[in-house]
Amino acid sequence: MSSRVCYHINGPFFIIKLIDPKHLNSLTFEDFVYIALLLHKANDIDSVLFTVLQSSGKYFSSGGKFSAVNKLNDGDVTSEVEKVSKLVSAISSPNIFVANAFAIHKKVLVCCLNGPAIGLSASLVALCDIVYSQNDSVFLLFPFSNLGFVAEVGTSVTLTQKLGINSANEHMIFSTPVLFKELIGTIITKNYQLTNTETFNEKVLQDIKQNLEGLYPKSVLGMKELLHSEMKQKLIKAQAMETNGTLPFWASGEPFKRFKQLQEGNRRHKL
């Protein structure tokens, strides 16, 4: 369980909701793992056709909690082996577990993007099959190079596939935000132009229910499996490449230094 993430089932919907708007829905590593566990739970429920990611407040999620990341660097490490083992356990394993849960998910993944999403949270948005935006103030930011490491949780695949290689190069290399005008038609399929997040969340569910009328449920899931098959294989392959690529950066200590600067207000994202 998490105080920042909850879930409930509503007919064909398994709804996962971020519920800490006071802290811009920032998440710990345990929260990301919990979301992955909920995806597995949704997979096992026959009546569920859609897994829906919702949020609350003005931000979808500001990404990982600075304090949670910096906590991983606490304590003395006596050897290089101990340091790497600790990082594999605390960072590499959760990243692989979360990315794999999204890659192999059988239900249609829908994201109700109510506001900006940053870091690993933005990576989850990019992994969804269908993304709806509340209004045109949303953006995605993948500040990995600004934080001292490289692409994680499938972004080396999702962004190149959905935004195109040149745009992905620019945003990933320079850690610049992907604004609404570029997201619409690539990652976002529809903009609801609403101001209230709860109204937006409910409207998306109503529209999906209406669109489901007359459809054969097994065809819905079969279509997801067919359309996602190529992406699924690419994501599974990317997990090893991304994890092995980013681990040396974490081992160098640079990301911890930069997260601490963010926490102390001495570093900012390019918003």
Swiss-Prot record:
Could you name the Gene Ontology cellular component terms for this entry? cytoplasm; peroxisomal matrix
Keyword rRNA-binding annotated: no
Give the transmembrane ranges: none
Q: Which reaction does it catalyse?
A: a (3E,5Z)-dienoyl-CoA = a (2E,4E)-(5,6-saturated)-dienoyl-CoA
Which UniProt keywords are listed?
Fatty acid metabolism, Isomerase, Lipid metabolism, Peroxisome
One GO BP on record is: fatty acid beta-oxidation
Segments carrying motif Peroxisome targeting signal (PTS1): 269-271
What EC number(s) is this enzyme filed under?
5.3.3.21
Its UniProt pathway annotation is: Lipid metabolism; fatty acid beta-oxidation
Which compartments does it reside in?
A: Peroxisome
**InterPro entries referenced in this protein's UniProt entry, alphabetically:** ClpP/crotonase-like_dom_sf, ECH/Chromodomain_protein, Enoyl-CoA_hydra/iso
Report residues binding substrate: 62-66, 120
The family database entries (SUPFAM superfamilies) matched by this protein are listed as: ClpP/crotonase
Q: Does the keyword Lipid metabolism apply?
A: yes
Can you tell me which residues form the catalytic site? 152
Induction per UniProt is:
By oleate, through the binding of the OAF1-PIP2 transcriptional activator complex to its promoter ORE element. Expression is also induced during ammonia pulses in yeast colonies, at the beginning of detectable ammonia production.
**Enzyme class at the top of the EC tree:** isomerase
Q: How does it assemble?
A: Interacts with ECI1.
Q: What does this protein do?
A: Peroxisomal di-isomerase that is involved in fatty acid metabolism enzyme by converting 3,5-dienoyl-CoAs to the corresponding 2,4-dienoyl-CoAs. Required for ECI1 to be located to the peroxisome.
The entry assigns this protein to a family as follows: Belongs to the enoyl-CoA hydratase/isomerase family.
Q: What is this protein called?
A: Delta(3,5)-Delta(2,4)-dienoyl-CoA isomerase
Which gene carries the instructions for this protein? DCI1
